């Protein structure tokens, strides 16, 4: 299965009638492997800061998580495994695997829990595959 198929079929799938706003799978080096059409343009620096927060949990807390022009307030996640952010009625979930970051962005009516489930389910699968 191609990386784009993982994004299209496993991240942008319908959950209780709702979809993520956008999603991507990005390498630890910040290069996008696959992304939905609406995924924001981001800087390599954005991904470097996210990777640093996985290595040093709390790194993003003072400044927030930036993805392109959008700033998310970092909320409770799982140190070294999952970063969650909130902005207004939406937010972001980032799951780290051995080689990639699985990123999902949502807005109402999708809930944070639904976004977490979609992103973490694919991330856990990729981890089990050694990816």
Curated annotation (Swiss-Prot):
Disulfide bonds join 13-115. GO terms for cellular component: cell cortex; cytoskeleton. Keywords: Actin-binding, Allergen, Cytoplasm, Cytoskeleton, Disulfide bond, Phosphoprotein. GO terms for molecular function: actin monomer binding; proline-rich region binding. A motif (Involved in PIP2 interaction) lies at residues 81-97. It is found in: Cytoplasm, Cytoskeleton. Coiled coil: none annotated. Gene3D superfamilies: Dynein light chain 2a, cytoplasmic. The modification Phosphothreonine is found at residue 111. InterPro entries: PFN (IPR048278), PFN_euk (IPR005455), PFN_sf (IPR036140), Profilin_CS (IPR027310). The keyword Flavoprotein does not apply. Phosphorylated by MAP kinases. GO terms for biological process: nuclear migration; regulation of actin cytoskeleton organization. Occurs in many kinds of cells as a complex with monomeric actin in a 1:1 ratio. Belongs to the profilin family. The variability of the residues taking part of IgE-binding epitopes might be responsible of the difference in cross-reactivity among olive pollen cultivars, and between distantly related pollen species, leading to a variable range of allergy reactions among atopic patients. Binds to actin and affects the structure of the cytoskeleton. At high concentrations, profilin prevents the polymerization of actin, whereas it enhances it at low concentrations. This is Profilin-8. The lineage of its organism: Eukaryota, Viridiplantae, Streptophyta, Embryophyta, Tracheophyta.
């Amino acid at each position: 299965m191609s990386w784009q198929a993982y994004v299209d079929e496993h991240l942008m799938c319908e959950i209780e009638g709702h979809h993520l706003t956008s999603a991507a799978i990005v390498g630890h080096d910040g290069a996008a492997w696959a992304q939905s059409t609406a995924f924001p343009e981001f800087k390599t620096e954005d991904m470097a800061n996210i990777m640093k927060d996985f290595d040093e949990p709390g790194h993003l807390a003072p400044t927030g998580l930036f993805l392109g022009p959008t700033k998310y307030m970092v909320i409770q996640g799982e140190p070294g495994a999952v970063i969650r952010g909130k902005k207004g009625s939406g937010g972001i979930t980032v799951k780290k695997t051995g080689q990639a970051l699985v990123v999902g962005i949502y807005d109402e009516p999708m809930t944070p829990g639904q976004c977490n489930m979609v992103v973490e389910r694919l991330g856990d699968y990729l981890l089990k595959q050694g990816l």
